[in-house]
Regions:
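Glycine-rich Rossmann-fold phosphate-binding loop(s) that bind the pyrophosphate
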Residues: 156-157
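Phosphate-binding beta-alpha-beta segment of Rossmann-like dinucleotide-binding domains, i.e.
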Residues: 88, 96-150, 169, 317
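N-terminal Rossmann-fold NAD(P) dinucleotide-binding loop
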Residues: 160-161
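Short beta->alpha connector loops at strand-helix junctions that form conserved
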Residues: 32, 52, 73-74, 90-101, ...
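Rossmann-like adenosine-cofactor binding region
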Residues: 56-61, 173-175, 180-273
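N-terminal glycine-/charge-rich "phosphate-binding" loop or analogous flexible N-terminal tail
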Residues: 1-46, 171-175
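Rossmann-like dinucleotide-binding domain for NAD(H)/NADP(H)
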Residues: 92-93, 229-318
């Protein structure tokens, strides 16, 4: 049975999930966290390494000659040098689609927090705002309906499609920026360009993977062409935006709000520009982390391992 080492298990399973489906397939060693300086020592005898955010570089791969398989406990696998892994005969598998519903739900939660101001009014009422009112309904800033409002989605993978489905229920006008043919998009979703999305939408929501080509594509130039007061939502990757440009657009009012579950550096430094910018709604990378979604990750990783050991690897990204 293979020697299996999980390098950073804590965020996936702080104690509420069972490792049994993985442990039954090999000798499993689980570390809650692994500093980069200890990766090689801890994985030296491993044939299978499981990781979430621990980085595996070509240099590290060269020092792990027994390694045959890397299981990424996530959909995104940019923490692994997959080209170097392939060149060294190491298979890399990810976990696709485990969190489609969870992330789509969180996207709507962030969006509705901005438009419906739930947190804002809850805080005002804790301060006695409503109790002092002479009227049954009291508001100082109106909430917004999404019916007829243009919401543009950048990327139409599983999550983007699910968000589109939810928005259509609320009768929003949903547009998509995607390389896919318009005929393949969900009913009622129209394909537009990136410039058109930022210039004509009330809300833009990011749902694309991070690549070197689109890193920080939401930059000062794009934001200068955006509709005044645009609401930007990001549950994809923090590095898709230029932090300084977005912070400055929030300061100037060019952006009306930025609601995100991801930042370019996680955890962020205390002086991260997004954290102190006005009209930001930041959650600490929790969209994926429902108990149901985390349980699916463990199950699919176990299925990936079983398939690999049977000689028919699945969900291969290398």
């Amino acid at each position: 049975m293979p020697n299996i080492v999980f390098l950073d298990s804590f965020v996936l399973n702080p104690g509420d999930l069972d490792w049994g489906v993985l442990a039954e397939q090999g000798q499993l060693t689980v570390y809650e966290r692994t500093p980069s300086a200890e990766v090689v020592a801890r994985a030296a005898e491993a044939e299978v390494v499981i990781l979430n955010k621990v980085r595996i570089t070509a240099e590290i791969l060269d020092r792990l000659p027994r390694l045959r398989l890397i299981l990424v406990a996530a959909t995104g696998y940019d923490v692994v040098d997959v080209v170097a892994a392939r060149e060294r005969g190491v298979t890399v598998c990810n976990v696709p689609a485990y969190g489609t519903l969870a992330v789509a739900q969180h996207t709507l939660a962030l969006l509705l927090e901005v438009t419906n101001r739930v947190g804002q009014y809850a805080q005002l009422n804790r301060e006695g705002y409503w109790s002092r009112s002479r009227d049954f309904s009291l508001w100082n800033e109106a909430v917004e309906e999404l019916s007829g409002v243009r919401v543009s989605l950048i990327g139409m993978g599983n999550i983007g499609r699910k968000v589109a489905e939810l928005l259509r229920v609320l009768e929003a006008e949903v547009c998509a920026v995607t390389s896919q043919d318009e005929s393949t998009l969900p009913t009622g979703v129209r394909k537009i360009t990136l410039d058109e999305a930022f210039a004509t939408s009330r809300i833009v929501s990011l749902h694309c993977p991070l690549t070197e080509q689109n890193r920080a594509f939401v930059n000062a130039s794009l934001l200068e062409r955006a509709a005044p007061g645009l609401i930007l939502v990001n549950t994809a990757r923090g590095a898709l935006i230029d932090d300084i440009a977005v912070a400055e657009a929030l300061q100037s009012g060019r952006l009306g709000a930025y609601a995100c579950d991801v930042l370019s550096t996680e955890p962020p430094a205390a002086d991260h520009p997004i954290l102190s910018a006005p009209n930001t709604y930041v959650t600490p990378h929790i969209a994926w982390a429902t108990a149901a979604a985390r349980g699916r990750i463990v199950r699919i990783m176990a299925e990936n391992l079983k398939a690999f050991l049977a000689g028919a690897p699945q969900n291969v990204v290398s």
